[in-house]
Amino acid sequence: MLIIGITGTLGAGKGTIVEFLTSQKGFVHYSVREFLKKKLLEIGLEANRDTLTMVANKLREANSASYVTDQLYEEALQSGSNCIIESIRTPGEIASLRKTGNFVLFAVDADPLIRYKRIYLRGSETDKISYEVFIANEAREMQSTN
């Protein structure tokens, strides 16, 4: 069993890689974002970039720096299939997954303006932001030390 972790900036193409690996290579997809959205629903909060970041940080503070991806890794193990864990964000998550011995990390990036245009076109509720907010959010997310 192989676990591929995908990290990268917003709108860089992580989803495109996931789509290829699931449709063409039979990988099973696990999403940090979807895991966090479920947690937000459980506590009655709307999913947006701020609440997703907030709940992720609270889970990490209450449990461990790698809590979210550890939970997804356990689900992946149960599947017995090659898996993708998408939207890995912190060094703690990467370090924990590397310890498994069956983990490869892909990092994806693209020019900020291209990425902003991509998120604007996909029209997700969490992506309805100005370019200035997009850049500010990205700078804030890059500051995480967990």
Residue spans for each PLM region:
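A glycine- and Lys/Arg-enriched "phosphate-lid" helix/loop adjacent to the NTP-binding pocket
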Residues: 49-51, 96, 100-146
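Conserved beta-strand segments of alpha/beta enzyme cores
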Residues: 26-28, 104
